[in-house]
């Protein structure tokens, strides 16, 4: 929301890395410039995470191509819109606990590995 920008900027300035989740949708892409502006103004590293992606949808590639214009890294892969995420929440668990060997947990572990590697490269 527009009124959240001041708080988001304060939080970003105190961060080492800001992840910008982007769903493959026109609404999310319309919000990207404001998010990039917050990251740039905070002088902090930022990266896009494709999230809530429909399985194998062509929009994923189109969204990735649109994000490349902003010059921030795009986390490899994506977080797919899987039932395991919703089911895990109803049990009060993270998807890595709920279905540890499932595809959703694999995607989250891959995201965490990328974050960890990025932070270690300061």
Regions found by a protein language model. Give the residues of each.
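Anionic-ligand binding region
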Residues: 14-54, 58-68, 79
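Short, basic/glycine-rich phosphate-binding loops at helix/coil junctions
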Residues: 13-17, 89-92
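Switch II (G3) loop of P-loop NTPases
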Residues: 1-11, 22-23
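Beta-strand-loop-alpha "switch" segments that mediate conformational coupling across diverse proteins
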Residues: 54, 64-93
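C-terminal boundary of histidine-terminating zinc-finger modules
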Residues: 89-110
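Short, hydrophobic alpha-helical segments
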Residues: 112-122
